[in-house]
Amino acid sequence: PLSLQLNAEANSAAFIAIAEALGKIAGGLHASNAAAELVENAVNSISNMERNDSIGTHAFAKAAFWLHNGGWEDTRFINKLAALFPEQSTINKRMIAFAMGRYRGPWYTDTLQVNRFLNSLQQEPDTLCIVAAMPVAGRTESALAAEYISKQLSNSDSNTELLVSACRASGKNAGVSAQKIEPLLQHKHLSVVLEACAALSGKQLNSEEINRVKQSMNSLPVAAQAAVVRMLHGQGDTLDVKVWISKIDQNLQPYERLACIRALGATGKSAAICFEQALKNPDILQANAYTEAFIEAHNQKDLEFSDTYASALIALMDRGDIGITALCAAEIRSANLTNEEKTNCNEVLNKHLNNLSLPKEVETANEIIKTINAIGKESRDEIKVAFNHPIDWEFVKSIPRKQRAQILTSKGIIEIELHVEEAPGSVASFIQLCKEGFYDGKSFHRVVPNFVIQGGCPRGDGMGGTDYTLRSEFRLHDYRTGSVGLASSGPDTESCQWFITHIPTPHLEGRYTIFAHVTEGMDIVDQIQIGDTIQRIVMLDQ
C-alpha cells in the first residue's frame, strides 16, 4: 500500500508522487464521503511523513493541496503549511500558497495564526506566491487581511494577475471598502475591470458611489458595462429594460452583444422579452444568451412566467439546440415544479435525449440524464464515451519530437511546443485539424482571468465539437503557466477545444490532457479577451 511505501521511498521524485497520490486519494474519497478509514490512514501517513528537507516539504504541500481541494478542514495541515512558509524556496512557497488557498475550514477564525501568516506574506516578493495565497486574505475577518488586500488594490501599476486576485479577495472580505475597489473600474485591462465589478457586487455602495459608477459607465468597454449592470442590480439600482435593449441593438461585436444580452436578465421586468428572443432569434448564440437571461430574470422574481415556467422551458428545449437544451435541463433540476410539471418535463427530456448525436453531444446528454435522475423515478448512469477514434500511428511517427506551432490571433502570435510523445493522439488530432483550416476564424469564447483562455469551438460557445472524441492522455506534467490542454466534459470526451493557462493550475492535473506548452507569446495570452479570434495555426519547420 502507498501509505506503507511513503517513508521507505528513497527516490525524491517517487516520494513526491506517492505523497501527492495519497493526497488525491484521500481528498477525493473525503469529498464523496467514502471510505473514512482509508482516508484516515492516508491522512496519518502524510502527517507522519519523516522526510523534513525541501523535498519533504514539497511533497507535504502537494498532498495537502489535494486534501484541501477535497474539502478537508482539519487544521493540522494548514497550521504546518503556514509555519513552513517563511523559510522555503520560491517553488516550495508557491506550492504551500496553492495548498493554503484551497483550504476552507475553521482555521480562518484563528486571528493569531492568520496574522502570523499574513505578516510572512507581506515580506514575499514573488507575485505568484501572493496570487496563490490571496484567497487566505479574502476568507478571514482579520483587520490585517483587509489592510493587506487594500494595499494591493491601491497599486494600479501592479501586474494584472495580482490585481485580479486582490479584487476577488476584496469581494469576500467585508473589511475592504468599496472606495478601495472603485478606482479599478477605470483600469486599462478589461480583466481587472470585470473583477472589480464582481467585487463591488458584494459591497453596499452609497448613493454617491452608485451615481459615480453610473456616470462613468459609458466610458467603459461594452463587456464592462454589462458587468456594471449586474453590479448595480445587486445594489437595488436596476436600469430600465428599454434603455438596455437599445444598447443591444447598437453596432456591437458579436461577443459584446452576447454580454449585453446576458445582463438583460438583471435589468428588471425582462423575462417576456428574453423568452421571445430565446424562442425565435435565428442567431443560435444569441438565443442561448437570451435563454440564460430568461432564466435569470425568472429567478430574480420576475413573475411573468410564475405559472407557466415549466411549459416555457419545454418550449425552449423544443428548439432542438443542444446548448439551450442543456441550460433548460439544468434549470429544471433546481426549479420548484409540481409533480405534473416534472412528468411533462421528463417526457420531453427523454425525447431530446434520444435525438442527440453521440459522442459529439455527450455533454448535453449527460446534463439531461442528471435531470431525469433528479426529477423522476429513474436512475440512469451517465454515458461513458466508447473508444471511437484510433490513433494514426504512421502519422504520429512523422511528427518531429519538439514540433512547434504558431497560433496567429487577432492580438498577436503565440508559439507552442507540442508534446507528441506524451499525448500522441491529442497532438495528431490537433495538427490534422490545423492543416484542414478547422481553427481558422474561430473565437476565444471563454476567458477566466488568472485561469485560462479557451477557444476552438465550432459553435463559439463551448458546446461544439468534432464528430469524434479522443482518449484522455494524462501524464505527469504539471499544469504551469502557459500549459496547453484539451477541454473535456469527462474522461475520453476531448475533441477540438483547447485552453492555455494564465498561471499554474494544479487542480487540473490528472483531469485534463496537456498536449503542449507556450514557448513565446505569454504576453499575448494575457491580452486575449472573449471574442478575440484565432486567424490560423501553422506548423513550423524544424
What do the predicted segments below correspond to?
Residues 22, 26, 38, 50, ...:
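A charged, solvent-exposed segment within the mature domains of Sec-exported extracytoplasmic proteins
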Residues 10, 89, 125-126, 157, ...:
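Residue-level recognition of short, well-ordered coil/turn positions
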Residues 88, 125, 158, 188, ...:
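Single, functionally critical "micro-switch" positions that shape active/binding sites
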Residues 1-4, 13-33, 53-73, 91-108, ...:
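Structural detector for internal amphipathic alpha-helices that build alpha-solenoid repeat scaffolds
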Residues 273, 277, 281-285, 292, ...:
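Cyclophilin-like peptidyl-prolyl cis-trans isomerases
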Residues 8, 48, 87-91, 123-127, ...:
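Short, mixed-charge aromatic SLiMs
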Residues 98, 179, 428:
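Short, contiguous clusters of charged residues that form electrostatic/catalytic patches at enzyme active sites
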Residues 1-7, 28-50, 72-86, 106-122, ...:
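Amphipathic alpha-helical scaffolding segments comprising HEAT/armadillo-like alpha-solenoid repeats
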